[in-house]
Amino acid sequence: MMNSFFDKMGEKLMPFASKVSANRYLNAIKEGFFGVMPVIIVGSLFLLFTSIPINGYNELMTGLLGENWSQIFMVPYRMSYGIMSIYVVVGIARSLAHFYKVDTRESIVVSFIAIFMLTPVLVTEDGLKGLPLDNFSASGLFLAIITTCLAVEIF
């Protein structure tokens, strides 16, 4: 009885699943995130090292590495999660460039230019200008995905 249920579900869902798997944008997004997974795993390990819930762990690490030991481990975390959108842009642009048979480097550069054009420039009270890194973290993923797909499509 269960086999017949799964067979019927397979018959109903297979056409939809094959259409979804053939979509170039979903494939590009999938490949972009697959490429980012090792970076995310490494960043997660460093974040884990800063917050292990064992009694005496913080004191041990402070004794070994000094008062600001957690900041040492947060640098790799910020370089992975903090700029995750940049890594995803490279993966998506690369995948779409292969699909359209255009130059990969040019597609990545065009995508970066589009992302930077949409990123607001912050001006501090001192008059210093800079890009907010929050837009390149996980909170900027949606904008990065849409912008990259559009930029490579137009390119």
What are these regions (language model features)?
Residues 1-40, 62-155:
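Signature of multi-pass transmembrane helix bundles
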Residues 41-67:
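Interfacial/capping segments of alpha-helical transmembrane domains
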